[in-house]
Amino acid sequence: MATRELILDGVPVLMYHGVAASAPATVDARELKYWVTTTAFRRHLVQIRLVGLKTGRLDDLRNAGVVLTFDDGRASDYETALPVLSQAGALAEFFVNTATVGQPGHLTWSQIAEMQRAGMSFQSHGHDHVVLLGLAPKLLDHQLRTSKHLLEDRLGRSVDFVAAPYGLLDRRVVAAALEAGYRAVCTSWSWPAQPGERTVNRVAIYAHTSEAQFAAILRQRPAGYLPELARTALGFVPKRVMLKVRPGRLGVQCDVRTA
């Protein structure tokens, strides 16, 4: 008798960082694994169509087949990802740090406005790209509210989701985000997202993500999620210890300036 394949409950929410023919020379070597080639990204969109899924929105997660998200507000979002998405008729959510808008290698406000007119959505990645864990309450609130308000003022629409930089968050960060007016906080926890939850799981897509693994992610098979989930779980405690003693080794920014 044939065995029934295990399918995970929820909605696949994919997390990208950069799409380009090759990563810019200014990208830190530790970030290269997050840069997906344009060819690979096109194939991903083809796979999504062949599986029979449609890209949707975080604010309508229950009816989405898959959600595409991009972190960091890189210039490649406009230069490379947008044309590919538009050609495929696909939607995506872009999480930007408002302090870096207009900086070299990042999106400008005019590009963000153009992308929104093209059907893309923008959410918060904090004001600065800093670790939110351990920030004093006032600084944490500043990071969350400043980004939300700037985006809302510029785009004329509500910003309901925030993604913690580096995927580092705890209950205090989630509570502060909800208090600041967000509906939910997006994580880097490799598992399908559950509609209606206060946290939204996302699975990272890497340069080394194979077509087979990508297909498993779309079909919500454990093989698409468990390897990254295990890596995250095993590194949870060591990563937090390193944050306290030698954060530079992780390539993260922990200091923040107030407005």
Locate predicted features:
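Histidine-centered catalytic micro-motifs
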Residues: 14, 121-129
